[in-house]
């Protein structure tokens, strides 16, 4: 789940990740990545889209667990778990708390426009923890993110100082990795699990949304 992709009229998608903007389109079973090169494909996009993992095998395995999972696997066979930049995943899921997708995307866009590096005219990378650690919650007022501003600043300061070590969460015991992320003000179990799954590819993480609980 990423908030920096926009669908175009022709069905292609424009997105920014790891400081690069690309256009992605699907033609049959072929995936085309435009505005890129072979080096970036090998070092960024192959990993980002998790292209080397056999999702067909995973669908087969989960289909045997429960009929509901079998139907879910059939419903959206093309879904892949994106390997996003960990700090960006952390911040965007902090922003996602008690929020809707349209508003989340707007806040993330304003965050990048105000504090991210311009990588091409009108396009901005996600701001670094170093940049955000220099700011105050009041500096984030243009984002219109409300109470989340102080959570974002706390996250930036703790990541930049090393108090929270995102990279260590790749190899820590799952529960310990969760606890590491929950040192950040405003990060509970769900945001920690989303960060672990989408930012650190800890596939044992299973974020449970409020709508799943209500169902």
Predicted regions and their residues:
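HhH-family (HhH-GPD) DNA N-glycosylase catalytic core used in base-excision repair
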Residues: 1-215
């Amino acid at each position: 789940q990423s908030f920096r992709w926009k669908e175009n009229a022709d069905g292609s998608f424009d997105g920014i990740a790891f400081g690069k903007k690309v256009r992605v389109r699907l033609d049959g079973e072929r995936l085309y990545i435009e505005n890129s090169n072979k080096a970036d494909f090998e070092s960024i996009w192959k990993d980002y889209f998790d292209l080397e993992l056999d999702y067909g095998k995973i669908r087969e395995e989960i289909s045997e667990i429960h009929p509901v999972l079998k139907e879910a696997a059939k419903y959206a066979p093309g879904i892949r778990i994106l390997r996003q930049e960990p700090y960006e995943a952390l911040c965007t899921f902090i922003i996602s708390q008690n929020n809707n997708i349209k508003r989340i995307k707007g806040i993330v866009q304003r965050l990048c426009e105000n504090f991210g590096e311009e990588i091409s005219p009108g396009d901005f990378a996600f701001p670094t923890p170093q940049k955000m650690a220099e700011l105050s919650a009041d500096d984030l007022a243009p984002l219109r993110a409300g109470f989340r501003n102080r959570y974002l600043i706390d996250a930036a300061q703790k990541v930049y100082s090393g108090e929270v070590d995102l990279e260590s969460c790749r190899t820590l015991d799952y529960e310990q990795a969760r606890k590491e992320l929950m040192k950040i003000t405003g990060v509970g179990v769900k945001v920690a699990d989303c960060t672990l799954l989408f930012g650190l590819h800890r596939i044992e993480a299973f974020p449970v949304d409020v709508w799943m609980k209500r169902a």
